[in-house]
Amino acid sequence: MQFLGRSISKSIRPSLNSTARKSWVLSSQQFLSTSSTESSSRTRGGGGGNRAEKSSEEWPRPMEVPYQPKIANSIDLIGYVHQPVQFDSTLDGKFWAGTVISHEPSSDSKSESDSSSNFWIPVLFEGDLAHTANSYLKKNDRVHITGQILGDVIQSGANSDQAHVQLFKSFHGSFSHQVMVRDLHYIEGSKAMPKVLPTLDQNEGVLKHSASVQRGREFGTNLWFDLVDKPNEWCDYREMKQNGSVNPKHPDFKKKDGSQALWLNNAPTEILSELKDVKFDIPKYAKQPKAGEESWKDLVDNMNKWWDNRVDKRTPKSPDFKHKETGVGLWLSDSPSWVLEKLPPPKSKTSDIYGVQEMF
């Protein structure tokens, strides 16, 4: 463009010089007046000069709005499911699903060089929405997603294929950012909605975060119906969790072969009502009688029959003393007032076993 501009300038320079010589014949006052008028006309666009003279105040300043954390880093996109959905659950009963959204459908015939132009966005689904995504989303489905961008650290030296593997293994890592999905929709006309969804959702083409998990035989959902249909294959730990016999994070139901576990906080609504009429096998644990005055007297009189856990309690909720034979537990917070002054100094379980004496 610069070269073209110089060529044009050279071609018109003689005519400009000729015009300039003629203009110098005029008086200086007339020249200045003419130049001023022409300059003003060019600047103001002819006759509408007031519009250009107005300052930026003519254009309204953007309004201020309060900061909203829920909207921060929000994202709203339409794309294609690039990879099959990966599903997993954690020991504390949370369910996760992950996939990658791309700006165009994936093609098996695409060469590796073409893949460099793809725009990939890793997305995560949590809870009920993870079940929904795992049940219905398929590769190349066109979807509308809203959610929030989560920052992450890129693992050095990972190529695109390795990045997908790392994402599906842990749903974290390899990608610098991921999207935690809040709402999931199908794009109208892109595919038929699953028939098991309510009619309202079929018409709107919407998969909502609060969509109830239907009785489809998919992983994560069918386990609850297997629990109801085959209660003899499951153990019920609900009562034990309430009385402290097992850890509060222990599964509410666990298959007898140890292959599956379920937590009530993730149960579908329709399952909760059915569980009331189902009888399960309850694991046999030594029943701990409620500690009374006699147990505290026995503790003071026969300390060698009790485990002293005051120093090395496994958890804050564990008993301070536990009978070696009956399994009865005692908590100092429930002890009578006369007990504390009669108890010996704390002694660990290790020293009790090996006969280690504390030196004072």
UniProtKB/Swiss-Prot annotation:
InterPro entries assigned to the protein according to its UniProt record, in alphabetical order: NA-bd_OB-fold, Primosome_PriB/ssb, ssDNA-bd
GO molecular function annotations of the record: single-stranded DNA binding
GO biological process: one example: DNA replication
Record field: transmembrane: none
Predominant location: plastid
Domain SSB: 71-188
Cell compartments where the protein resides: Plastid, Chloroplast
Claim: Glycoprotein is one of the keywords in the record: no
An example Gene Ontology CC term for this record: chloroplast
Keywords noted in UniProt: Chloroplast, DNA-binding, Plastid, Repeat, Transit peptide
Biased composition (Low complexity): 33-43
PROSITE patterns in UniProt: SSB
Region of interest: PDF region 2: 296-344
Biased composition (Basic and acidic residues): 51-61
Transit peptide stretch: 1-61
Annotated spans, PDF region 1: 224-276
Region spans: Disordered: 28-64
Top-level division of the source organism's lineage: Eukaryota
Its biological purpose: Binds single-stranded DNA.
Protein name (database record): Protein OSB4, chloroplastic
Organism of origin: Arabidopsis thaliana
